[in-house]
């Protein structure tokens, strides 16, 4: 056995004409035996390299030293294979590659010198070596067969008798072979050359008749080379038989790259079947011969699919069998063929791994003949045994006869044959035996045939072949042989043209003098030129050749009637004189070129300078000419065909859609019926209640107001409807993104919420059709769900409606379907041009909106000039820069100031303010004004609903602020009712310059823009009145570099207005809107996989890495928790949880294991554990003592999800979850701590997890992570609460001494703490106790909507999105935050304008209206954005002795609640805070008085009224501090809220008894771990004073909002106390400090305790105030600055 791998060579050819016309670039590089290919679509990608046995560079000319010629290819491959053949091995060479890559050139070559391919050179070299042999004892014989495999059919190219398709059979001894394939004996190279030429002619004739192309068929040229050696001494002759298979494979191109359709597509499918099977065979053989599988036993799955195609079946021995095989892969160098070339390289790379086991075929005949004779004997015995012996005798007689005698014998013995058939039918298996017998005897006869008989048979076949060609009119040589590549010198003739260049000009037909007839073989008269195939008539045409007086012969073509004959593309119906070079097409597939040598010679003599044609006159030229002359527009035909296909597709899609819709309706009806059954089963009482008639309830006027308020609220409620839109359309968004990624469109789609506000007005195309109808009745701005389209290619952002997305998605699907039929290169070419027809792109403007700014005009009422510096705010609430604008009143003839060279002077614009138009604008934008004036509650100002408990307490700041057109208008400080009362009187006397009917002129000057990012270039600004959309004033664009001085516009615009009531109202309340635009020149959009869920989070790369929050580990003993739907939140508690892992010590005690706290983040730490020691887990819960939270028992403690990474895949089922045995649980009572402590302990055997991570010593720098979940039952709760924590652990050996970390050493060194107090990990949690939602409540009914979240549905191509998901509920919460930010920015601008105007009036020593006085401003500030209209005294101050009426008390209480919500917008228990403040701080004041270090202050107490100036000081003045006592219900959905809080203030036992007797409602617990903020606002030491304590305590405080973490010292690593700043009230009073003589102090009040804190200095105290409550600190600093300015004026 001789094992050797397949020799693989690759060869790259030069560019062809098509590639040169398209300016193709070379993507192939060769160095030695290495071939490298470059991806033209991604040049930056690393080139792919392949290593082969030979890499032939034939891309350049022969002058190149690296050029590989035909000779070199043969020397490397052909000579080696020929040597193997002489050694007795089977040999195979096959060429592979796409059509036109140069396979046939490499294998066959051309007739010119040095252009012959491997086959001719190998045949010539074969006979050269035979002739050079001088050994008389050696004799050689060569036999040749030539076949073609086309569409899985085999044709014999050498024997004209074998016209049909030959059968491929398999013999148990010979293997696969072609039955009746002629093997012709040859004695010289000329014989082989003639046979190859004859075979190519036969191939050409057959291909032309059948309208085929050689590139779609495989050609196999077999040489059977026999060597006989006679040993004179022993008189024994030995033989070596070698089979040389030379294969020219069909093209490997894809159907889409050739445009194949119909029959061509079928042919391509069959070709690709052969090549695909060949690829499978090569891959399977390479897999078997690869390293890992080479020494393994052959499995049943190691199947080689040889039989899947004829080609691989016949080449079975050559592929991995008894053969020496070489493969030549032909490559195209052009970039347009990159995909096919890369496929060829990979094909060849797999082939080189195949190993063949070749053996020397020595003396095969003797053994073969013996085995065949044995088989014949066995088969005969079988037939005799079945009584069919006479059949064999008759068969032998028929086989031995000549063809003529056989026919006569058959005719004479018809009766006997029929009887034989009858006998065969009744003898099972006999027909197959006879067939095999015939087959075997035929092979025996072929093997026993002598060499002389083979030569005689070869000669007979040659004569038959030449006679057949002569009958067809093919020109012959004088000796009778066929003409090869030969051109007559005088006689006119026709040469064939073929699609395959190697088959063109292969057949030559003489046109004799006189008449030459062309037609079919079965014509009435004998035809001189015989053609066949479709559209060829029996008598097709006549060529008439006449000689005129010795001059050249004139050839005339006369078509017969009805025959399709074309000359130079024009159909010929009358005799036509032919000229040399004319193209003649007969029928549909026969293409010829007419050559007239004499005529051509005379033409050259007459016009010696005749130009050569620009392109070769070949088959393609003739076909193109035919289409042009016949007026056939292929493009139009293709479009028509495409239109028909589209219509058919549309019809079928409509039918499918209709059927799908019917099916959907059917399913929906079934689901609805099932849903009704479920509803009737689970909510029977709801249906019964609904069916019962309800009695009409008599409501009071107040109750009617509340009902009307609730109706309006729920009518415009949008939270759930927006969520339904997000859920229902998520699948469309995901599909659009998937198609965009697959088509490489560089466009991202994501949901976005848009609200119609001043900073973000909605464009008309985004408003739904019903927007105009409900605009007048809608009290709140409309919020819509839109799609944000981020065009990364052009750096543009567009907004689409959901309807537009669905429409575009249909077009995207059609584009995706069409993309499968278009080559990828064409798609990318089209992608470079953004056209209006692409559904992914929209037209984008050059300028993009940077942001908007607003300038109020109330200074024109006085009039004083003002210069504003206003913020430029984007639609997302981001401050993009600042704009300086000056507004002043001028006289009509006043000239503009001189600003130097940068002046932009505009003329005076005349604008009219129509009262009716402005009133319409006000009614459309602020429809709630009318309701407000009729006494409607201000609760109607709420915009954003649905934050659960927040809705129960009262309107939040974001709810009020978001309403940009409210009853008490949002301008607040500019237009509240109290200011109107103060303004109207003085203004009526002072508005001489604004008399009705007069012309008033004022000037708006756009001065400068600053702090605008450099990503916006060419900045310009335009401004207009807010209710006018038809015209705007614009500045000139300025270049923006982001550096240097501000951009100076200095644009002056004078505006003249006829004074009307609407104009005066406008400048009192409305601003001018300034819009800043710029050209955006960066593309900052991230890829889809980087899409963040919340744009508000800080970038995590700047902060330490934190562990992700895991979901609870599922319980093993408890039944599946069916969480009921939570209703309104009842209360919330902050939990501080300690986790300890205790290990068994030598003395029998369990000591907490050491915890490494390095990392600096709270609630983190690594347990350092010993291997193989018993352990216990201790969990301690700490929280404030409250009546609602009572722990009952620990139901289960489970641990699982053992891993070595912080992240975990929670979707997988963990088999190693372990439920721990609870050893103890209960309350503990540490000394000097009034908080509640609940502790439980469980035994943990880590070996029970059966995890290697827990059983072994942890490798260096690796950590083990585990998740713990505790299920704790609480009283009055429907289900257990779950506390979940991720542990980080490192296991050391049992006897290892753990080195204490730096933090632990510092802790021990201080001596202030025991080691056990630091060996714990903390966690901060929020416990929410919610009521169980009523099944029949509107909230439950809304939650039971059948709207499915489609974001989880699978979409084809979703895996390419790399984890991207559509935005969902979090988008609504983020948008609320954005709306609040926009509202706050708007309020800041109003307040800044108000303060600027007041300061301007004071500095100008003008009388300041009472509405702008400092005392009045304090009153306004205390009310936030809405103030009550309180009666004023003559001096303009509120009378402290005057009793407020009911409405005023309601407004005062509402203001208190609004202010507490403003400072702590997440705080939901403001009514409790008031009572807690009083009780706890009163206790603190008593403690202060008892402290001997404090001076006695008599009966002075620290009351909430004195320590909470933010609540009451602003409303009632600094001189009379008292707590408001509301005596009526507030305008709130819970009218008993505040009176109940007042009653709680009284420490009455009766009150407590009543509380105990109240029936306890079941609650739903929910515990969420709080993610610790990485941002430290402030840290340092503070002194604490709590009630019932002896004195001040010094603690280390770290503020990470919204929590403040308390430590015993700065060395302490364990959190001892946490303070939730979001629910705490921070209070500060200078008077209280002076009274108690405790400087630098402030108070923090929670629901359960009050704490007094003292800082080291005044500056330190203000820093702490800013860290605890930035808004309060800002208020204090503002008051201090006003106080200092007032003192300076005094």
UniProtKB/Swiss-Prot annotation:
PANTHER family reported for this sequence: KINESIN-LIKE PROTEIN KIF1A ISOFORM X1, STAR-RELATED LIPID TRANSFER PROTEIN 9
Specify the effect of residue 220 to I.
No effect on microtubule motility
The PH domain is annotated at 1575-1673
Q: Which residues form a coiled coil?
A: 366-383, 429-462, 622-681, 801-822
- So what does mutating residue 13 to H actually do? In KAND; complete loss of motility, when tested in vitro
Q: Name one GO cellular component term.
A: neuronal dense core vesicle
Annotated consequence of substituting residue 210 to T? In KAND; uncertain significance
Q: What is its main location?
A: cytoplasm
All copies of the Kinesin motor domain together span 5-354
Q: How does it sit in the membrane?
A: Peripheral membrane protein
Q: What is the effect of changing residue 307 to P?
A: In NESCAVS; affects subcellular location; contrary to wild-type, does not accumulate in the distal tips of differentiated SH-SY5Y cells, but localizes closer to the cell body in transfected cells
Q: What is the effect of changing residue 217 to Y?
A: In KAND; affects subcellular location; contrary to wild-type, does not accumulate in the distal tips of differentiated SH-SY5Y cells, but localizes closer to the cell body in transfected cells
For this UniProt entry, the molecular function terms from Gene Ontology, in alphabetical order, are: ATP binding; ATP hydrolysis activity; cytoskeletal motor activity; identical protein binding; microtubule binding; plus-end-directed microtubule motor activity
Could you identify this protein by its name? Kinesin-like protein KIF1A
Enzyme class (EC, first level): isomerase
The protein's matches in CDD domains, at most eight in alphabetical order, are given as:
FHA_KIF1A, KISc_KIF1A_KIF1B, PH_KIFIA_KIFIB
Q: What is the effect of changing residue 274 to L?
A: In KAND; retains its ability to move processively along microtubules, but shows reduced velocity and processivity; decreased interaction with microtubules
Residues with the modification Phosphothreonine, per the entry, are 607, 612, 1519, 1523
Q: What is the effect of changing residue 350 to G?
A: In SPG30B; reduces accumulation in distal regions of the neurites
Q: Where in the cell is it found?
A: Cytoplasm, Cytoskeleton; Cell projection, Neuron projection; Cell projection, Axon; Cytoplasm, Perinuclear region
Q: Where does ATP bind?
A: 102-105, 215
Q: Which residues form the FHA domain?
A: 516-572
| Residues reported to bind Mg(2+) | 104
Asked if the record carries the keyword Signal, the reply is no
Cite the record's note on assembly.
Dimeric motor; dimerization is required for ATP-driven processive motility. Monomer in vitro. Interacts with PPFIA1 and PPFIA4. Interacts with CALM1; the interaction is increased in presence of calcium and increases neuronal dense core vesicles motility. Interacts with PPFIA2 and TANC2; both interactions allow the recruitment of neuronal dense core vesicles to dendritic spines and decrease in presence of calcium. Interacts with SYT4 (unphosphorylated) and SYT11; both interactions increase in presence of calcium. Interacts with MADD.
């Amino acid at each position: 056995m001789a094992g050797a791998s397949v020799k693989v060579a690759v060869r790259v050819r030069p560019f062809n004409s098509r590639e040169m016309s398209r300016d193709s670039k070379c993507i192939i590089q060769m160095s030695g035996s290495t071939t490298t290919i470059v991806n033209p679509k991604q040049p930056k990608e690393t080139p792919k390299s392949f290593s082969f046995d030979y890499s032939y560079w034939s891309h350049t000319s022969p002058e190149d030293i690296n050029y590989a010629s035909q000779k070199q290819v043969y020397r490397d491959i052909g000579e080696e294979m020929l040597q193997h053949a002489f050694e007795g091995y089977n040999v195979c060479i096959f060429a592979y590659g796409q059509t036109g890559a140069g396979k046939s050139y490499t294998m066959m070559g051309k007739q010119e010198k040095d252009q012959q391919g491997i086959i001719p050179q190998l045949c010539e070299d074969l006979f050269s070596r035979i002739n050079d042999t001088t050994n008389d004892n050696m004799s050689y014989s060569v036999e040749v067969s030539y076949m073609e495999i086309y569409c899985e059919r085999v044709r014999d190219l050498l024997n004209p008798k074998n016209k049909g398709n030959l059968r491929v059979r398999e013999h148990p001894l010979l293997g696969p072979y072609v039955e009746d394939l002629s093997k012709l004996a040859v004695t010289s190279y000329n014989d082989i050359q003639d046979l190859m030429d004859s075979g190519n002619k036969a191939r050409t004739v057959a291909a032309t008749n059948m309208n085929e192309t050689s590139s779609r068929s495989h050609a196999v040229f077999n040489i059977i080379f026999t060597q006989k050696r006679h040993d004179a001494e022993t008189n024994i002759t030995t033989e070596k038989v070698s089979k040389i298979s030379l294969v020219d494979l069909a093209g490997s191109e894809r159907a889409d790259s050739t445009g194949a359709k119909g029959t061509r597509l079928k042919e391509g499918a069959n070709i690709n079947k052969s090549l695909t099977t060949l690829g499978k065979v090569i891959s399977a053989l390479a897999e078997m011969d690869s390293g890992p599988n080479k020494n393994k036993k052959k499995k049943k799955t190691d199947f080689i699919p040889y039989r899947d195609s004829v080609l691989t079946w016949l080449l079975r021995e050559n592929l991995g069998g008894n053969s020496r095989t070489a493969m030549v892969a032909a490559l195209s160098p052009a970039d347009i063929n990159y995909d096919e070339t890369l496929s060829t390289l990979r094909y060849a790379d797999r082939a080189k791994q195949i190993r063949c086991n070749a053996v020397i075929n020595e003396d095969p005949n003797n053994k073969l003949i013996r085995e065949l004779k044995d088989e014949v004997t066995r088969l005969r015995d079988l037939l005799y045994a079945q009584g069919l012996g006479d059949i064999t005798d008759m068969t032998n007689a028929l086989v031995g006869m000549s063809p003529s005698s056989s026919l006569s014998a058959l005719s004479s013995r018809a009766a006997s044959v029929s009887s034989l058939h009858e006998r065969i039918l009744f003898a099972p298996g006999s027909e197959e035996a006879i067939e095999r017998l015939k087959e075997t005897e035929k092979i025996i006869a072929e093997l026993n045939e002598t060499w002389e008989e083979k030569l005689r048979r070869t000669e007979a076949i040659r004569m038959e072949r030449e006679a057949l060609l002569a009958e067809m009119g093919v020109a012959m040589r004088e000796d009778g042989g066929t003409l090869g590549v030969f051109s007559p010198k005088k006689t006119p003739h026709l040469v064939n043209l073929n699609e395959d260049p190697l088959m063109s000009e292969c057949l030559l037909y003489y046109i004799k003098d006189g008449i030459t007839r062309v037609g079919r073989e079965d014509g009435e008269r004998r035809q001189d030129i015989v053609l066949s195939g479709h559209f060829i008539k029996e008598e097709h045409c006549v060529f008439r050749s006449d000689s005129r007086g010795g001059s050249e012969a004139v050839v005339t073509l006369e078509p017969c009637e009805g025959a399709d004959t074309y000359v130079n593309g024009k159909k010929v119906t009358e005799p036509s004189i032919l000229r040399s070079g004319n193209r003649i097409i007969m029928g549909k597939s026969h293409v010829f070129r007419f050559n007239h040598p004499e005529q051509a010679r005379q033409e050259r003599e007459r016009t010696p300078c005749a130009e050569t044609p620009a392109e070769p006159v070949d088959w393609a030229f003739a076909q193109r000419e035919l289409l042009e002359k016949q007026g056939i527009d292929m493009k139009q035909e293709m479009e028509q065909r495409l239109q028909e296909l589209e219509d058919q597709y549309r019809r079928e899609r409509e039918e499918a859609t209709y059927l799908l819709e019917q099916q959907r309706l059917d399913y929906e009806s079934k689901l609805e019926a099932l849903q009704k059954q479920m509803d009737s089963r689970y909510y029977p009482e709801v249906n019964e209640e609904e069916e019962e008639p309800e009695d009409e309830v008599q409501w009071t006027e107040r109750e009617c107001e509340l009902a009307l308020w609730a109706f309006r609220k729920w009518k415009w409620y949008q939270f759930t409807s927006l969520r339904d839109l997000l859920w229902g359309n998520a699948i469309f968004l995901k599909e659009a993104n998937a198609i965009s990624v697959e088509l490489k469109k560089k466009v991202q789609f994501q949901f976005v919420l848009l609200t119609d506000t001043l900073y973000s007005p909605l464009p008309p195309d985004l408003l739904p059709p019903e927007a105009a109808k409900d605009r007048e009745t809608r009290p709140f701005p409309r919020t819509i769900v839109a799609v944000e389209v981020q065009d990364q290619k052009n750096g543009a952002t567009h907004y689409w409606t959901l309807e537009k997305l669905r429409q575009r998605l249909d077009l995207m699907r059609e584009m995706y379907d069409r993309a499968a039929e278009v080559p990828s290169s064409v798609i990318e070419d089209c992608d470079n041009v953004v056209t209006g027809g692409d559904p992914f792109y929209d037209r984008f403007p050059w300028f993009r909106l940077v942001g908007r700014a607003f300038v109020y005009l109330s200074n024109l009422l006085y009039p004083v000039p003002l210069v504003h510096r206003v913020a430029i705010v984007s639609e997302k609430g981001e401050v993009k820069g600042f704009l300086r604008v000056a507004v002043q009143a001028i006289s009509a003839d006043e000239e503009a100031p001189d600003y130097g060279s940068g002046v932009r002077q505009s003329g005076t614009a005349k604008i009219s303010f129509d009262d009716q138009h402005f009133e319409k604008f006000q009614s459309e934008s602020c429809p709630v004004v009318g309701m407000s004036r009729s006494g409607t509650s201000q609760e109607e100002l709420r915009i954003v609903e649905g934050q659960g408990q927040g809705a129960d307490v009262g309107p939040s700041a974001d709810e009020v602020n978001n309403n940009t057109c409210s009853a008490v208008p949002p301008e607040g400080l500019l237009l509240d009712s109290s200011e109107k009362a103060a303004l109207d009187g003085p203004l009526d006397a002072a508005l001489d310059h604004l008399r009705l009917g007069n012309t008033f002129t004022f000037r708006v000057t756009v001065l400068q823009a600053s702090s605008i990012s450099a990503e916006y270039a060419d900045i310009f600004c335009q401004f207009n009145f807010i209710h006018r959309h038809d015209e705007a004033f614009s500045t000139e664009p300025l270049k923006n570099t982001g550096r240097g001085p501000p951009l100076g516009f200095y644009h002056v615009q004078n505006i003249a207005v006829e004074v009307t009531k609407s104009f005066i109202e406008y400048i009192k309340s409305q601003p001018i809107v300034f819009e800043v635009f710029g050209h955006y020149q960066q593309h900052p959009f991230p890829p889809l996989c980087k899409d963040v869920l919340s744009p508000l989070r800080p970038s995590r790369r700047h902060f330490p890495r934190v562990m992700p929050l895991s979901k609870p580990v599922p319980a093993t003993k408890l039944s599946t928790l069916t969480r009921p739907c939570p209703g309104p939140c009842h209360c919330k508690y902050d939990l501080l949880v300690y986790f300890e892992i205790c290990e068994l010590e030598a003395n029998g005690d369990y000591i907490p294991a050491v915890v490494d706290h390095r990392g600096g983040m709270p609630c983190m730490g690594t347990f350092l554990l010993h291997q193989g020691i018993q352990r216990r887990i201790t969990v301690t819960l700490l929280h404030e003592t409250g009546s609602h939270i009572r722990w009952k028992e620990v139901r289960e403690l489970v641990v699982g999800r053992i891993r070595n990474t912080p992240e975990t895949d929670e979707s997988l089922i963990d088999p190693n979850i372990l439920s721990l045995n609870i050893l103890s649980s209960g309350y503990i009572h540490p000394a000097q701590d009034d908080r509640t402590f609940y502790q439980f302990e469980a035994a943990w055997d880590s070996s029970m997890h059966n995890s290697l991570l827990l059983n072994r010593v942890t490798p260096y720098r690796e950590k083990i992570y585990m998740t713990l979940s505790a299920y704790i039952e609480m009283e009055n709760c429907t289900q257990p609460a779950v506390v979940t924590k991720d542990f980080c652990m490192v296991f050391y050996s049992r006897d290892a001494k753990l080195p204490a970390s730096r933090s632990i050493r510092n802790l021990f060194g201080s001596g202030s703490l025991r080691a056990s107090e630091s060996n714990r990990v903390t966690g901060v949690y929020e416990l929410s106790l919610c009521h169980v939602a009523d099944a029949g409540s509107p909230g439950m009914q809304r939650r039971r909507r059948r709207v499915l979240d489609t974001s989880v549905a699978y979409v084809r191509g979703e895996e390419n999105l790399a984890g991207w998901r559509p935005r969902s509920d979090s988008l609504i919460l983020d948008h609320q935050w954005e709306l609040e930010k926009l509202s706050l920015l708007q309020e800041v601008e109003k307040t800044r304008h108000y303060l600027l105007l007041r300061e301007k009036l004071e500095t100008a020593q003008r009388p300041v209206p009472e509405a702008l006085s400092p005392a009045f401003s304090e009153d306004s500030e205390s009310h936030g954005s809405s103030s009550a209209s309180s009666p004023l005294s003559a001096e303009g101050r509120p009378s402290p002795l005057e009793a407020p009426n009911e409405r005023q008390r309601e407004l005062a209480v509402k203001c208190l609640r609004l202010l507490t919500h403003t400072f702590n917008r997440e705080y939901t228990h403001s009514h409790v805070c008031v009572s807690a403040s009083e009780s706890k701080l009163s206790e603190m004041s008593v403690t202060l008085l008892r402290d001997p270090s404090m001076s006695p202050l008599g009966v002075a107490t620290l009351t909430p009224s004195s320590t909470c100036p933010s609540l009451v000081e602003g409303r009632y003045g600094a001189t009379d501090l008292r707590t408001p006592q509301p005596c009526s219900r507030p305008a709130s959905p819970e009218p008993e809220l505040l009176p109940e809080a007042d009653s709680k203030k009284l420490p009455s036992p009766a009150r407590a008894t009543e509380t105990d007797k109240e029936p306890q409602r079941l609650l739903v617990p929910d515990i969420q771990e709080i993610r610790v903020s990485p941002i430290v606002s402030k840290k340092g030491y503070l002194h604490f004073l709590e009630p019932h304590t002896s004195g001040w305590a010094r603690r280390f405080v770290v503020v990470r909002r919204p929590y403040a973490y308390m430590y015993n010292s700065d060395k302490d690593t364990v959190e001892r106390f946490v303070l939730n700043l979001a629910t705490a009230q921070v209070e500060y009073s200078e008077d209280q400090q002076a009274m108690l003589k405790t400087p630098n102090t402030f108070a923090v009040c929670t629901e359960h305790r009050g704490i007094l804190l003292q800082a080291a200095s005044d500056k330190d105290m203000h820093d702490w105030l800013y860290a605890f409550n930035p808004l309060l600190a800002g208020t204090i600093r503002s008051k201090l600055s006003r106080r200092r300015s007032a003192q300076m004026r005094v």
